[in-house]
Amino acid sequence: MNDSEFHRLTDTLWMTIEERLDDWDGDSDIDCEINGGVLTITFENGSKIIINRQEPLHQVWLATKQGGYHFDLKGDEWICDRSGETFWDLLEQAATQQAGEAVSFR
């Protein structure tokens, strides 16, 4: 994968997250902001999830209250380089915990 393809894939990932949060109708207030390739999700309780791209490594990094995760693209999925879990699974787990209610991105 070259840098332009990596940017296209991560831009698509960011847009998907933003669209899902815009459509979300849960009880909690969840805000999403994209700035300089960094996506920040802010929850009503003040906690945050930070997602950014690591261009030199062609990885997506996810920082949550539970810890940090690094994802490599394998086929069509971003997969954690330690646990083997998918990006969407770990993001949903963290968002659900930090929002205090179920949050789905799929």
From Swiss-Prot:
<dbReference type="GO" id="GO:0005829">
    <property type="term" value="C:cytosol"/>
</dbReference>
<dbReference type="GO" id="GO:0016226">
    <property type="term" value="P:iron-sulfur cluster assembly"/>
</dbReference>
<comment type="function">
    <text>Involved in iron-sulfur (Fe-S) cluster assembly. May act as a regulator of Fe-S biogenesis.</text>
</comment>
<dbReference type="GO" id="GO:0008199">
    <property type="term" value="F:ferric iron binding"/>
</dbReference>
<dbReference type="InterPro" id="IPR020895">
    <property type="entry name" value="Frataxin_CS"/>
</dbReference>
<comment type="similarity">
    <text>Belongs to the frataxin family.</text>
</comment>
<dbReference type="InterPro" id="IPR047584">
    <property type="entry name" value="CyaY"/>
</dbReference>
<keyword id="KW-0408">Iron</keyword>
<dbReference type="InterPro" id="IPR002908">
    <property type="entry name" value="Frataxin/CyaY"/>
</dbReference>
<dbReference type="Pfam" id="PF01491">
    <property type="entry name" value="Frataxin_Cyay"/>
</dbReference>
<keyword id="KW-0479">Metal-binding</keyword>
<dbReference type="GO" id="GO:0008198">
    <property type="term" value="F:ferrous iron binding"/>
</dbReference>
<dbReference type="InterPro" id="IPR036524">
    <property type="entry name" value="Frataxin/CyaY_sf"/>
</dbReference>
<protein>
    <recommendedName>
        <fullName>Iron-sulfur cluster assembly protein CyaY</fullName>
    </recommendedName>
</protein>
